[in-house]
């Protein structure tokens, strides 16, 4: 009976949509990564577009595959009440005022905002706001492929469907 349940579970697993394997900021601060960037999703519990990103964009199989393979994906509640350590620095929750944005989210102007960090923890790029999966794939691949060092983003967007997407799809299907 256990064998049959295992076989059924294995078969159903292939039918389930891809999911991003999110990590906590605590896990990320202790992770030893060399060949990936950190992708930090700064969100709040009240943010409607944050929930829409989770529901629509991050559930997209291509988005999930890129994030899981090329980045170290982290979710961080920008209103967290925990003190955290990140790359040798300590960040504390804010206790002043109505907008209690965590010290680690300082500089984030709105939610959702996604920040890419190099492996050493230095910020590379902030990406503010909601984006549908079709647009987010372009943004993620721009950084995952290293094309961010070769082309300005506006040119890259124009090239993507004809010149870059076929290469990306081959790479993702390896």
Model-derived segments and their meaning:
Residues 51-55:
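Detector for the c-type heme attachment site
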Residues 61-64, 68-133, 138-145:
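Thioredoxin-like thiol-disulfide oxidoreductase module
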Residues 130-174:
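Thiol-/selenol-based redox modules, centered on thioredoxin-like
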Residues 22-26, 60, 98:
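Structural motif corresponding to alpha-helix initiation and N-cap regions
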Residues 34-48, 73:
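Short active-site neighborhood of thiol/selenol oxidoreductases, capturing the structured segment around
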Residues 21-37, 67:
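A short beta-strand-turn-helix
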Residues 1-21:
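Bacterial Sec-dependent N-terminal signal peptides
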Residues 37, 41, 57, 130-134:
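Soluble non-cytosolic domains of exported or imported proteins
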